[in-house]
Amino acid sequence: MHIVRVSDADHDARLNQAAAASSLFDPVIEERTRTIIEAVRARGDAALVEFTQRFDGATLTPEQIPVTQAERMQASLMAGPDLRAAVAESAKNIASFSKRSRRRDWSAKNSHGAQVGEVFQPFQRVGVYIPGGTAPLVSTALMTITLAKVAGCPEIVVCTPCGKDGTLNPALLFAANFAGATEIYRVGGSQAIAAMVHGTETIRPVHKVFGPGNAYVVAAKRLLFGHVSVDLLPGPSETLVLADDSADPRFVAADLLAQAEHGSGHERVWMVTTSAAQLKAVEKEISRQLPTLNRREFIQKVLDTNTWLIQVRDLNAAVSLINRLAPEHCEIMTRNPKALVPRIHAAGAIFLGQGSPTVLGDYVAGPSHVLPTGGAGRSFAGLTVDQFQRRTSVVEYSKPALRKALKGVATFAGLEGLDGHGRSAAIRLEPQPKGR
């Protein structure tokens, strides 16, 4: 772990090191991803079959790429009561939150008396990527597909990698089915993103791509942006805990360890505190709790490379550091956590008080856990239902309203040398020629 104390002579330099930007950009990965994308574009299903064999160890035919209704039914039959209850609880909260967040049509009159407004319609066909990796991200299926369902997207396409035997995790399959996936394909990685964007013989193209993934998935989304829209480019998980001397160090340590166990080894965790005693107590708690966790080997890698316990001079310095780091998750365990919220401008999600660990947001609270990472929170927000909606403006002018607008149109058309623009408006107020 990296430990930074106020008394350190190089304190400010260490803070700069802690705030160094994280990026999934890798020129080697990007070049490999370009090759995969081009192969899928050129060879379609044949390329998907080849890459599934190479990267996932599964031998499939093109006909086996789609998940069948029988498989979906079997996953539902296999789902036990605890899984059913957890999925239903999470989906209910996600849907409730998303319904409040969904954008709605509006209409009003402008200064000319014309009717102007916006209409919000769902994307007709969306693609959702659900990662595989060292742990099945069942919750990610809910945190993406549910939003598409609430938005009203009629076609929700899901791609997720299969195991060596060609099967999908039954819990993940159950969650995707429950949330509202209309099509599910056993294909992963950048080849899945390419298939959803360019289409193959089996997978028809989508209009927008959603979901997190590894460096290859992120590279594919970056390279294919412009062919379609994408949501975010989220990387490995991040959590920052701001704790004063009132925080329970057991809670702080548990939350840091929880976010370090995802498995990529690139997760980043920070504890920021004004208290030297708190820093020492959290360090001790991490050492005590680590041996009790099943994924301690994954966690240890993150502790060795990307874990920071940082003491700052005061809460003002803490807030400044948080805004520099722009963490994916920001927990505030201070005496008055709500007072700090208006001052935090770049966190993906904020969790207030000692009873609000990040894992609640990961699984059941309601907001989507697909959030910006690597400092992107300064420019991007987390996934919301309105990203599954497309906006269209609507304008309706009557003749009286057009008459009021004509002078302004003529002025701009003259300034820009576009007389056809001016004519397009003016002709509507001219008398109709006789004989027509």
Report each predicted region and the residues it spans.
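N-terminal Rossmann-like NAD(P)+-binding subdomain of aldehyde/semialdehyde dehydrogenases
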Residues: 1-124
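Short internal beta-strands
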Residues: 154-164, 269-275, 282
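C-terminal core of ALDH-fold dehydrogenases
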Residues: 315, 323-436
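Short acidic-hydrophobic, aromatic-tinged amphipathic segments that line or gate anion-handling sites
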Residues: 3-9, 183-188, 309-314
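A glycine- and small/hydrophobic-rich beta-loop-beta segment
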Residues: 262, 271-347
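Conserved NAD(P)+-binding/catalytic subdomain of aldehyde/semialdehyde dehydrogenases
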Residues: 180-258, 262-268
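Conserved small-residue-rich beta-alpha loop and adjacent elements
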Residues: 108-174
